């Protein structure tokens, strides 16, 4: 569906929230040792982000997903405190997530790249988000927006407005497979999220398991 631009995609290690700088540093190191070259944290503290950057070194892209914890004022304060750690993006820093005008102001005032969209359910919401200038990276979730057709509408909307698509995909089953195939059809594919945890088994065996931080898109 949509054709296949490539069958090799870049993945990133998406860590849980640990709220422990030493544990964050350890998980970052083990992710890098396993071949991932991009790391996402789920932290809301400066100490944890600092520990991740120290563990990763200066050249590894690091993102921080905060899951909508802050007011606009708090988000600006934290964005400035996190700026020295050179984040690729700051994800969902403001509650409520549909406060696109505040996200746009934060993005403009802080100069920090903003990612959002996992809580948006239609192309109409993404249109408003992008129109407001709220995001550098748009993050539709194929399981939340209603499937492949709506995802493709959002993809086209993002491309038309110069916004990079970075799908939200912390899944293990059909949603993850759909994300892989949709991303493979993108002219400018984003990175694909891999929840970094020990699995008893993978639903599809080794077919979707990243090797050295990359996926081979299954047929």
Set out the residue ranges of the language-model regions.
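Catalytic core of soluble alpha/beta enzymes
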Residues: 41, 46-171
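Conserved beta-strand termini and adjacent loop/short-helix elements that scaffold enzyme active sites
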Residues: 14, 117, 168, 194-195
């Amino acid at each position: 569906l949509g054709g296949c631009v490539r069958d090799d995609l870049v993945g990133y290690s998406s860590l849980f929230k640990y709220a422990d700088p030493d544990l964050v540093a350890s998980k970052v190191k083990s992710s890098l040792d396993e071949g991932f070259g991009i790391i996402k944290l789920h932290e809301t503290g400066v100490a944890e982000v600092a520990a991740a950057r120290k563990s990763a070194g200066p050249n590894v892209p690091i993102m921080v997903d905060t899951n909508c914890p802050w007011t606009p004022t708090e988000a600006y304060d934290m964005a400035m405190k996190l700026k020295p750690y050179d984040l690729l993006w700051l994800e969902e820093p403001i509650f409520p997530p549909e406060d696109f005008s505040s996200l746009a102001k934060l993005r403009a005032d802080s100069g920090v790249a903003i990612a959002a969209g996992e809580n948006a359910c239609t192309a109409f919401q993404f249109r408003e988000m992008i129109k407001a200038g709220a995001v550098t990276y748009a993050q539709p979730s194929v399981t939340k927006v209603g499937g492949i057709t709506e995802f493709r509408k959002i993809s086209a909307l993002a491309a038309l407005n110069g916004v990079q698509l970075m799908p939200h995909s912390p899944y293990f089953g059909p949603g993850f497979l759909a994300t892989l195939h949709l991303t493979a059809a993108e002219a400018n594919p984003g990175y694909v999220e891999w929840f970094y945890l020990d699995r008893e088994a993978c639903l599809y065996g080794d077919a979707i398991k990243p090797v050295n931080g990359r996926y081979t898109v299954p047929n």
